[in-house]
Amino acid sequence: ILFSGDTVARRLLYGLTGCPPLSLFCNDLQRLQQLPIRNIYSAHDRAALPPDYPSYMSRMLQTKLSAAAETWQYPGFPLMRRLVTGDEASPDYFDAAVPDARFQEENTHAI
């Protein structure tokens, strides 16, 4: 069993304070797949997440975030790029928000 706190969760608010680059975070999510995890309990989900959810998160962040057109802004937060996939009642639901400036900067350095 993995108690993941805010790191592996269906709702991810990423990159506001002291976080590694998104690419490193995705690599670390993939590394979790090497562990014998049967269930994942996050700080915010009411049910266990499947053991392959970290890989799913990584795949969504690496392949879908760049195409996400939705942005989100809340007082005191920077402009966030938001990705929402799946229906909230389904196991494949994922809602991620990443500071748009940070995302743009990482993509510029990757080119």
Segments from the language model and where they lie:
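Catalytic core of the metallo-beta-lactamase
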Residues: 1-31
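Accessory terminal helices/loops
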Residues: 30-39, 43-111
